[in-house]
Amino acid sequence: MTTIITVRKGGKVVMAGDGQVSLGQTVMKGNARKVRRIGKGEVVAGFAGATADAFTLLERLEKKLEQYPGQLMRAAVELAKDWRTDKYLRNLEAMMLVADKSITLAITGNGDVLEPEHGTTAIGSGGNFALAAALALMDTDKSAEEIARRALDIAADICVYTNHNVVVELLDAEG
Protein backbone atom coordinates (compact mmCIF):
# COMPACT_ATOMS: atom_id res chain seq x y z
CA MET A 1 0.00 0.00 0.00
CA THR A 2 1.31 3.48 0.75
CA THR A 3 0.84 6.54 2.92
CA ILE A 4 -0.66 9.87 1.83
CA ILE A 5 -1.05 12.88 4.13
CA THR A 6 -2.57 16.34 3.81
CA VAL A 7 -1.63 19.16 6.20
CA ARG A 8 -3.17 22.66 6.33
CA LYS A 9 -1.19 25.25 8.25
CA GLY A 10 0.05 28.80 7.84
CA GLY A 11 -1.95 29.53 4.71
CA LYS A 12 -0.63 26.46 2.90
CA VAL A 13 -2.09 23.10 1.93
CA VAL A 14 0.46 20.32 1.55
CA MET A 15 -0.21 16.84 0.25
CA ALA A 16 2.63 14.34 0.44
CA GLY A 17 2.98 10.66 -0.32
CA ASP A 18 5.65 8.03 -0.39
CA GLY A 19 6.71 6.20 -3.53
CA GLN A 20 6.57 2.52 -2.62
CA VAL A 21 4.64 0.04 -4.74
CA SER A 22 4.41 -3.43 -3.23
CA LEU A 23 3.20 -6.69 -4.67
CA GLY A 24 2.54 -8.96 -1.75
CA GLN A 25 5.70 -8.90 0.34
CA THR A 26 7.90 -7.61 -2.48
CA VAL A 27 8.76 -3.98 -3.20
CA MET A 28 8.24 -3.56 -6.95
CA LYS A 29 9.02 0.15 -7.20
CA GLY A 30 10.25 2.79 -4.80
CA ASN A 31 9.64 6.03 -6.67
CA ALA A 32 6.02 5.98 -7.81
CA ARG A 33 4.21 9.33 -7.91
CA LYS A 34 0.96 8.94 -5.96
CA VAL A 35 0.37 12.65 -5.37
CA ARG A 36 -0.41 14.95 -8.29
CA ARG A 37 -2.24 18.08 -9.39
CA ILE A 38 -5.52 17.75 -11.23
CA GLY A 39 -8.33 20.07 -12.29
CA LYS A 40 -6.19 22.71 -14.04
CA GLY A 41 -3.71 22.57 -11.15
CA GLU A 42 -6.20 23.86 -8.58
CA VAL A 43 -6.65 20.50 -6.82
CA VAL A 44 -4.09 18.11 -5.38
CA ALA A 45 -4.95 14.43 -5.17
CA GLY A 46 -3.26 11.45 -3.61
CA PHE A 47 -4.23 7.81 -3.63
CA ALA A 48 -3.62 4.59 -1.75
CA GLY A 49 -4.61 1.14 -2.90
CA ALA A 50 -4.54 -0.58 -6.26
CA THR A 51 -2.74 1.73 -8.69
CA ALA A 52 -4.82 1.02 -11.79
CA ASP A 53 -8.00 1.48 -9.75
CA ALA A 54 -6.72 4.76 -8.36
CA PHE A 55 -5.90 6.10 -11.83
CA THR A 56 -9.40 5.19 -12.99
CA LEU A 57 -10.85 7.13 -10.06
CA LEU A 58 -8.54 10.12 -10.64
CA GLU A 59 -9.71 10.28 -14.26
CA ARG A 60 -13.33 10.15 -13.11
CA LEU A 61 -12.72 12.89 -10.57
CA GLU A 62 -11.11 15.09 -13.22
CA LYS A 63 -14.24 14.67 -15.37
CA LYS A 64 -16.42 15.63 -12.41
CA LEU A 65 -14.25 18.71 -11.82
CA GLU A 66 -14.75 19.70 -15.47
CA GLN A 67 -18.49 19.25 -14.95
CA TYR A 68 -18.46 21.21 -11.65
CA PRO A 69 -15.54 23.68 -11.93
CA GLY A 70 -14.38 25.16 -8.63
CA GLN A 71 -16.71 22.85 -6.67
CA LEU A 72 -14.47 20.14 -5.21
CA MET A 73 -17.06 18.99 -2.67
CA ARG A 74 -19.74 18.58 -5.33
CA ALA A 75 -17.35 16.77 -7.69
CA ALA A 76 -16.23 14.46 -4.86
CA VAL A 77 -19.80 13.63 -3.82
CA GLU A 78 -20.77 12.89 -7.42
CA LEU A 79 -17.70 10.64 -7.79
CA ALA A 80 -18.55 8.85 -4.54
CA LYS A 81 -22.12 8.26 -5.74
CA ASP A 82 -20.85 6.75 -8.98
CA TRP A 83 -18.21 4.73 -7.13
CA ARG A 84 -20.80 3.26 -4.80
CA THR A 85 -23.55 2.55 -7.33
CA ASP A 86 -21.72 1.63 -10.55
CA LYS A 87 -21.24 -2.14 -10.86
CA TYR A 88 -17.72 -1.78 -12.33
CA LEU A 89 -16.51 1.06 -10.09
CA ARG A 90 -17.82 -0.61 -6.94
CA ASN A 91 -15.07 -3.24 -7.24
CA LEU A 92 -12.23 -0.72 -7.39
CA GLU A 93 -9.92 -0.90 -4.39
CA ALA A 94 -8.46 2.49 -3.65
CA MET A 95 -8.90 5.49 -1.39
CA MET A 96 -8.23 9.13 -2.24
CA LEU A 97 -7.36 12.38 -0.54
CA VAL A 98 -8.17 15.55 -2.46
CA ALA A 99 -7.66 19.17 -1.51
CA ASP A 100 -8.06 22.62 -2.96
CA LYS A 101 -7.48 26.05 -1.45
CA SER A 102 -10.48 25.74 0.86
CA ILE A 103 -11.26 22.09 1.62
CA THR A 104 -9.62 18.71 2.20
CA LEU A 105 -11.60 15.51 1.58
CA ALA A 106 -11.09 11.78 1.97
CA ILE A 107 -13.09 9.76 -0.57
CA THR A 108 -13.73 6.04 -0.08
CA GLY A 109 -15.31 3.27 -2.10
CA ASN A 110 -18.04 2.98 0.53
CA GLY A 111 -19.44 6.27 -0.69
CA ASP A 112 -17.89 8.30 2.12
CA VAL A 113 -16.74 11.86 1.48
CA LEU A 114 -15.14 12.95 4.73
CA GLU A 115 -13.83 16.40 5.60
CA PRO A 116 -11.28 16.22 8.43
CA GLU A 117 -12.00 18.46 11.39
CA HIS A 118 -8.80 20.51 11.14
CA GLY A 119 -7.80 19.94 7.52
CA THR A 120 -5.16 17.36 8.36
CA THR A 121 -5.69 13.72 7.52
CA ALA A 122 -3.90 10.66 6.16
CA ILE A 123 -4.75 7.42 4.38
CA GLY A 124 -3.04 4.17 3.49
CA SER A 125 -1.15 1.53 5.39
CA GLY A 126 0.85 4.10 7.37
CA GLY A 127 -1.94 6.65 7.54
CA ASN A 128 -2.64 6.41 11.25
CA PHE A 129 1.07 6.70 12.10
CA ALA A 130 1.48 9.73 9.83
CA LEU A 131 -1.68 11.39 11.12
CA ALA A 132 -0.66 10.96 14.77
CA ALA A 133 2.79 12.38 14.04
CA ALA A 134 1.36 15.35 12.11
CA LEU A 135 -1.16 16.19 14.82
CA ALA A 136 1.61 16.08 17.43
CA LEU A 137 3.65 18.55 15.34
CA MET A 138 0.86 21.03 14.55
CA ASP A 139 1.58 23.20 17.61
CA THR A 140 5.26 23.58 16.72
CA ASP A 141 6.80 26.27 14.53
CA LYS A 142 7.24 23.78 11.67
CA SER A 143 5.64 24.63 8.32
CA ALA A 144 2.92 22.51 6.74
CA GLU A 145 5.51 20.96 4.40
CA GLU A 146 7.94 20.20 7.23
CA ILE A 147 5.14 18.57 9.22
CA ALA A 148 4.01 16.45 6.25
CA ARG A 149 7.57 15.31 5.47
CA ARG A 150 8.35 14.46 9.11
CA ALA A 151 5.05 12.62 9.52
CA LEU A 152 5.80 10.50 6.45
CA ASP A 153 9.32 9.80 7.73
CA ILE A 154 7.86 8.53 10.99
CA ALA A 155 5.28 6.41 9.15
CA ALA A 156 8.01 4.96 6.89
CA ASP A 157 10.05 4.00 9.96
CA ILE A 158 7.09 1.99 11.29
CA CYS A 159 5.14 0.76 8.24
CA VAL A 160 6.83 -1.75 5.90
CA TYR A 161 4.57 -0.65 3.01
CA THR A 162 5.76 2.98 3.18
CA ASN A 163 9.18 4.30 2.14
CA HIS A 164 11.17 7.51 2.56
CA ASN A 165 10.88 8.62 -1.10
CA VAL A 166 8.44 11.52 -0.62
CA VAL A 167 6.60 13.55 -3.28
CA VAL A 168 5.05 16.84 -2.13
CA GLU A 169 2.48 19.14 -3.76
CA LEU A 170 1.75 22.55 -2.27
CA LEU A 171 -1.20 24.95 -2.66
CA ASP A 172 -1.97 28.32 -1.14
CA ALA A 173 -4.95 28.01 1.22
CA GLU A 174 -7.84 30.35 1.93
CA GLY A 175 -7.85 32.26 5.17
From Swiss-Prot:
Entry binding sites for Na(+): 156, 159, 162
Which coarse location class applies to the principal site listed for this UniProt protein? cytoplasm
Q: Give the top-level enzyme category.
A: hydrolase
Q: Cellular component GO terms, alphabetically?
A: HslUV protease complex; proteasome core complex
**Any one Gene Ontology molecular-function term assigned to this protein's record:** metal ion binding
Q: Which InterPro entries match?
A: ATP-dep_Prtase_HsIV_su (IPR022281), Ntn_hydrolases_N (IPR029055), Proteasome_sua/b (IPR001353), Proteasome_suB-type (IPR023333)
What start-end ranges are recorded for coiled-coil regions in this protein? none
Among the Pfam families in the record, one is Proteasome
Question: Keywords, A to Z?
Answer: Allosteric enzyme, Cytoplasm, Hydrolase, Metal-binding, Protease, Sodium, Stress response, Threonine protease
Q: Which residues form the active site?
A: 2
Activation and inhibition: Allosterically activated by HslU binding.
Subcellular location per UniProt equals: Cytoplasm
Catalytically driven reaction(s) = ATP-dependent cleavage of peptide bonds with broad specificity
Name the record gives this protein: ATP-dependent protease subunit HslV
